[in-house]
Regions:
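Glycine-rich phosphate-binding loop plus the immediately following alpha-helix
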Residues: 128-156
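A glycine- and small-aliphatic-rich helix-loop capping segment at beta-alpha/alpha-beta transitions
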Residues: 19-21, 76-84, 109, 125-130
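Short glycine-rich anion-binding loops that position phosphate/pyrophosphate groups of nucleotides
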Residues: 10, 64-67, 116-119
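Short glycine-aspartate micro-motif
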Residues: 2-6, 56-60, 91, 109-113
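Conserved phosphate-binding catalytic cores of ATP/NTP-utilizing and phosphoryl-transfer enzymes
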Residues: 87-111
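Short glycine-rich, Thr/Ser-proximal phosphate-binding strand/loop in the N-terminal lobe
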Residues: 2-43, 54-55, 128-130, 134-135
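Short beta-strand scaffold segments in enzyme catalytic cores
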Residues: 12-17, 101, 112, 118-123
């Protein structure tokens, strides 16, 4: 079995794929490696994750606050996730990489995320080669859920 985890600041979807290719999703609170301590990440996994832990061979974790821009946070997250699942293979990188791989596959293209925060990139089919760093969902990623909600509440 392997897991593909898609994590933003609001929620994490853990997609467990078994040997027959059947995928089952489980949800926890969001895990943002930059904004959370290793203890708080452990708490989310221990208290909220209800999927299988045994027999997991690989975890592919795509998350906010992960990737080359945040090496220390990514290493911390990888250590906690690996300890929790005890898997032999672990990849922890940006949620933007997940978006680019899902949208573009192995082709070049532009990929975006519009969630609690917003982000975009140019992907060359292998890696992200251009990215304007977002300000973060608190400061105002225009088009994000946080900004749209602020605008709605301001009009009420």
């Amino acid at each position: 079995m392997y897991i593909i985890a898609d994590s933003g600041s609001t929620k994490t979807q853990w997609c467990v794929v078994d040997a027959q290719g059947v995928a089952t999703s489980y949800f926890t609170s969001g895990i943002n490696a930059v904004m959370m301590t290793s203890e708080s990440i452990k708490a989310v996994l221990t208290d909220e994750y209800t999927g299988p832990k045994e027999g997991i061979e690989a975890v592919y974790f795509y998350g906010a606050g992960c990737g080359p821009a945040f090496p220390a946070a990514t290493a911390t997250l990888a250590e906690v996730v690996n300890e929790f699942f005890g898997c032999s293979k672990l990849e922890a990188t940006s949620d933007l990489v997940a978006s680019a791989r899902a949208v573009c596959g192995h082709e070049a293209g532009i990929a975006c995320i519009l969630g609690t925060g917003a982000n975009s990139c140019y992907y060359d089919g292998t890696e992200i080669v251009k990215n304007v760093r977002p300000l973060g969902f608190i400061l105002g990623d225009e088009g994000s859920g946080a900004v749209m909600c602020k605008k709605l509440l301001a009009d009420v």
